[in-house]
Amino acid sequence: MLSRGKRLGYAAYERLLQWELSGTPDHVAVIMDGNRRYAEKQGTKKQEGHKEGAQTTEALLNWCDELGIREVTLYTFSTENFDRDPEEREHIFDLVEQKLRTFADADRVHEAGVCIRAIGETEMLPERVRDAIDYAEGRTAQYDQLNLNIALAYGGRAELLGAARDVAAAVENETLDPTDVSAETIEERLYEGPTRDVDLIVRTGGDERTSNFLPWHANGNEAATFFCTPYWPEFRKVDFLRAIRTYQNREDSWRTTRAERSLALVRAIEQSELPTAKRMLGRFRDALPSTEREQLDEEYDLAD
């Protein structure tokens, strides 16, 4: 239990972080790690760690709704998790089934326009979990304000391997010309789920690795990553805001780099190409350091 002073400090820091944010990612993927280690630290059963982790998941969805994030993907159960103790595994399945049905019926889910979808090799899951998936997807299929993708029986390598096999089979059957294979060809054969590339990956629990989560949507987009030490049940809104700040800092750095490269390009091109280059540079003008921005305005008259 935190002291009153610490609670006030966290609240103030949380407000400061939120005030400093100038933008949020469209798609956040979360690796919710540390439920079992949290339970061990607390001296309780693993099941209690998973229950408390589920409460953090509900809080996360509220934060995403508040901040206007459009898509969230939760790494809930990997294909490797099938190797866990049967009792723990069944408890996780019970919890997933319960939460899927609860979310699907929750007023706040319908008010916020949340569309729930499962991604992964769901045919490997128990029938009761598959039924709960069908129920949740059916109840929320009409919404598009916030896409909630729940990764169940998911493995990044398996997803890419399945897509590659489908492409190979199509080529062998002569329904696909090898010269027509493109990024879109692969993407069409991935698990049906994410509608956007991942902007930010968050992992709790102290491990600094992405566990091959959403490799096509995250690695291909060079998503920002945020690793933090709190176990998933300990994850707070202030931690989430710090993660978003990491994304924001990366975006700001990217824009500055693009702006500086555009400026170098403008200075190097021929006069006949200058109008096109100036339009491109104008898009990134505000990302330049103030001294370079002033010099740019003077040289090329880009200021409003």
From Swiss-Prot:
Mg(2+) binds at residue 33. It holds the Pfam family Prenyltransf. Substrate binds at residues 34-37, 46, 50, 78-80, 82, 84, 203, 209-211. The keyword Acetylation does not apply. Binds 2 magnesium ions per subunit. Keywords: Magnesium, Metal-binding, Transferase. GO terms for biological process: polyprenol biosynthetic process. SUPFAM superfamilies: Undecaprenyl diphosphate synthase (SSF64005). Gene3D superfamilies: Decaprenyl diphosphate synthase-like (3.40.1180.10). Its cofactor is Mg(2+). Transmembrane segments: none annotated. Its EC number is 2.5.1.89. Homodimer. Catalyzes the sequential condensation of isopentenyl diphosphate (IPP) with geranylgeranyl diphosphate (GGPP) to yield (2Z,6Z,10Z,14Z,18Z,22Z,26Z,30E,34E,38E)-undecaprenyl diphosphate (tritrans,heptacis-UPP). It is probably the precursor of glycosyl carrier lipids. Belongs to the UPP synthase family. This is Tritrans,polycis-undecaprenyl-diphosphate synthase (geranylgeranyl-diphosphate specific). It comes from Haloarcula marismortui (strain ATCC 43049 / DSM 3752 / JCM 8966 / VKM B-1809) (Halobacterium marismortui). The lineage of its organism: Archaea, Methanobacteriati, Methanobacteriota, Stenosarchaea group, Halobacteria. The gene is uppS.
